[in-house]
C-alpha cells in the first residue's frame, strides 16, 4: 500500500493556552485498508502530521535542526485504537504536553471524530532533544524552553488521562 499525495492539516489555535491545540483533517481514500477502515499505519501518519504542526509552535519545527543544530528523536510511543473511522470522515486531534525536563518531552495526542467527538485513538510519545554535532542527548536551547515551559504549566492544570504510562501485556487471572 503506497501513500497518496498528502496535504498538511489545517491547524487552528485558540488564544488561550488552556485550549489545547486542535488540528482538523479528513480520512483519505488511500488510508483505507482491506477491512474497509483506516489502516493502523495511517493513524501513525495522522499523528505525525500533527506532531510537525505542534512542534512548530514549541520552537521545534522543521527549521530546528538547521537553526539550533539539534533535533527531536522519538524514544517510544504507545497508540490506543479505540474506534474505527472510514473514508471521508472528519478527525480532530489535540495535543497535551504531559511533562518536560531539560532534554525530554512527553505528550499525548488525542484523536476524536470530527462530528460527534467520540474518542478514536490516542498516541502517547516520549521524545528527546539530540545534538546533531555528536548525536547525543542535549539540553533544550533556552528559546525552546521559553516556549515549552508556559505550555507545560498550563497543561499541568488538565487531567492526566488514565491511559498515560501504561504497559502492553496480556492480563492473566489467577486460576
Describe each PLM feature range.
Residues 2-92, 98-175:
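Terminal targeting signals and extreme-terminal segments of soluble enzymes
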